[in-house]
């Protein structure tokens, strides 16, 4: 009986499937990426970044060295320079991975004192403790104001307290720093010394002569006089300017003509100074301007300490990109598992092929009733199932 074309087709499919499984098993066990046929000569250690072992399926064992330009070279692991290079790379990788490549540095809080603002103040005002009140500062203010009045007619240069305060203000704005609370007393003294006015009797009697003398001296000066200010003790909301700018700098005008005009027009100053007596002291409540938080005038007037805002500065850099070599270890269990799966798949294919062939043969088999009919002692027997040729067999 000759096999049908369908049987040949099934056999051919089984053969191709078997041919596919066998190379797959071979490639699964032999994963050699780098074939080391030629070993390299000595390479400087400074040019190497990592190394790795070649696969066992490559046959010849070698060390694959990678340079800084990401080029790979094969080296003999038995040579001494190769072993030294491996030790150096292992030590370097261990040093990098010891702390994870992350470091944190703490910078101590540095709050520089304001030296320019206190240039025109007495040493006793600078050494005041934090709990100094306005009554303690009043004595210093009177002496400072008397010295300022005495030197105003002879000196062409403005007092150092005003120039120092303006310079320190610009520097503090540029640096973005916040002064400590113990320097509040120096700020208040510098601010109050710029707003001290003469007594009402002197102001009313010699206002015209003083204005003329001031007008003759003002064009030669380069900075505004401490007498020219738009701050008023009765209105603390005008004293507090925008954040980061002191009140005695915000309201000033650099032109002496406009400052003299503001003296004559503004009635608030005349009313306030006429109500004062010659022995009265000035007690304005001016809050020092901070770059982060502005305390209320009530807290400054009562002598309470402003809240400290000190945040540690952490300089944390990103972790370094570590390229730690991970050498692949061949897993024998995985290889055995792959072989078992491949064998089971092949046996399953053979079983399916046998069932298909048996079913085909059973379909092509001839039943007994088709053996033929007897005619005159002869029986017609077909040559094969499904054929139209018969053979006469004597009975």
Curated annotation (Swiss-Prot):
Biased composition regions of type Polar residues, renumbered to the chain: 148-172, 201-210
Keywords: Cell adhesion, Cell membrane, Chemotaxis, Cytokine, Disulfide bond, Inflammatory response, Membrane, Secreted, Signal, Transmembrane, Transmembrane helix
Tissue: Highest levels in brain. Lower levels in kidney, heart and lung. Also found in skeletal muscle and testis. Highly expressed in lesional smooth muscle cells, but not macrophages. Low levels of ABCD-3 mRNA were also found in anti-CD40-stimulated splenic B-cells, but not in resting B-cells. Also expressed in dendritic cells.
Protein name per Swiss-Prot or TrEMBL: Fractalkine
TM helices/strands, residue ranges: 337-357
Membrane protein topology class: Single-pass type I membrane protein
Organism per entry: Mus musculus (Mouse)
Mucin-like stalk, as annotated region: 101-336
Gene: Cx3cl1
GO BP, one annotated term: positive regulation of angiogenesis
Coiled coil: none
Sequence ranges on the Extracellular membrane side: 25-336
Biased composition (Low complexity): 218-236
Keyword Metal-binding: no
Subcellular location as annotated: Cell membrane
Induction, as annotated: By 12-O-tetradecanoylphorbol-13-acetate (TPA) and lipopolysaccharides (LPS) in bone marrow stroma cells.
């Amino acid at each position: 009986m000759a096999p049908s074309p369908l049987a040949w087709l099934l056999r051919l499919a089984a053969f191709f499937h078997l041919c596919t499984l066998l190379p797959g098993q071979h490639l699964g066990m032999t994963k050699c990426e780098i074939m080391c046929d030629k070993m390299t000569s000595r390479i400087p250690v400074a040019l190497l970044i990592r190394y790795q072992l070649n696969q066992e399926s490559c046959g010849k064992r070698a060390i694959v060295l990678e340079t800084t330009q990401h080029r790979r070279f094969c080296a003999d692991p038995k040579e001494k320079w190769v072993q030294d290079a491996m030790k150096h790379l292992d030590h370097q990788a261990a040093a990098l991975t010891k702390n994870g490549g992350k470091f944190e540095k703490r910078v101590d809080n540095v709050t520089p004192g304001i030296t320019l603002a206190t240039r025109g103040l007495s040493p006793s005002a600078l050494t005041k403790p934090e709990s100094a009140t306005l009554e303690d500062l009043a004595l210093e203010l009177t002496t400072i104001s008397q010295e300022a009045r005495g030197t105003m007619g002879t000196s062409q240069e403005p007092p150092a307290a005003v120039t120092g305060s303006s310079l320190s203000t610009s520097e503090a704005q540029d640096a973005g720093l916040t002064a400590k609370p113990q320097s509040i007393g120096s700020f208040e003294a510098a601010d109050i010394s710029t707003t001290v006015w003469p007594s009402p009797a002197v102001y009313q009697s010699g206002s015209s002569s003083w204005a003329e003398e001031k007008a003759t001296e003002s064009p030669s000066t380069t900075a505004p006089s401490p007498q020219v200010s738009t701050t008023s003790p009765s209105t603390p909301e005008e004293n507090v300017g925008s954040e980061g700018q002191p009140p005695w700098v915000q309201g000033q005008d650099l032109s002496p003509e406009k400052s003299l005009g503001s003296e004559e027009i503004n009635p608030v100053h005349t009313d306030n100074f006429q109500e004062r007596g010659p022995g009265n002291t000035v007690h304005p409540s001016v809050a020092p301007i901070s770059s982060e938080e502005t305390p209320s005038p009530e807290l400054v007037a009562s002598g309470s300490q402003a809240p400290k805002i000190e945040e540690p500065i952490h300089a944390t850099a990103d972790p370094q990109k570590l390229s730690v070599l991970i050498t692949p270890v061949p897993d024998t269990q995985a290889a055995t598992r792959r072989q078992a799966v491949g064998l089971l798949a092949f046996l399953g294919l053979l079983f399916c092929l046998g069932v298909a062939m048996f079913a085909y043969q059973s379909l092509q088999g001839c039943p007994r009733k088709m053996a033929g009919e007897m005619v005159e002692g002869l029986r017609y027997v077909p040559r094969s199932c499904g054929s139209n040729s018969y053979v006469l067999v004597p009975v």
